[in-house]
Amino acid sequence: MSEPLHALAKQLEQAIRASEPFQQLKRAYEDVRRDETAYRMFANVRDIQLQLHEKQMRGAAILPDEIEQAQKAMALAQQNEKLARLMALEQQMSMTIAEVQQIAMKPLEELHRSFMEGR
């Protein structure tokens, strides 16, 4: 990565870490960690998601009962106030990161578009 872009990426990382949405997410993780029930439910959902992701990466079929198990675990987790808050904050942070990525990719997208229009 060129030095100026690398420096800007580091500044962006620091800005994300210092942002209020990230700090809220960090506090939500700490709240879940301190609550044994919420932490166990979080770990269960994470484990199920990882197992399904691994199967998907291997090209293995995900069975309907596995999907149902994941949906039930997620529904149960969403009933926990701390986990529901954590998931909502994660979603917001993911959307923010996606918007930043979209902005960063704009020059490349414009280059591709102008290249294809030039034919």
Curated annotation (Swiss-Prot):
The lineage of its organism: Bacteria, Bacillati, Bacillota, Bacilli, Bacillales. Belongs to the UPF0342 family. InterPro entries: Com_YlbF, YheA/YmcA-like_dom_sf. It holds the Pfam family Com_YlbF. Disulfide bonds: none annotated. It comes from Geobacillus kaustophilus (strain HTA426). This is UPF0342 protein GK0640.
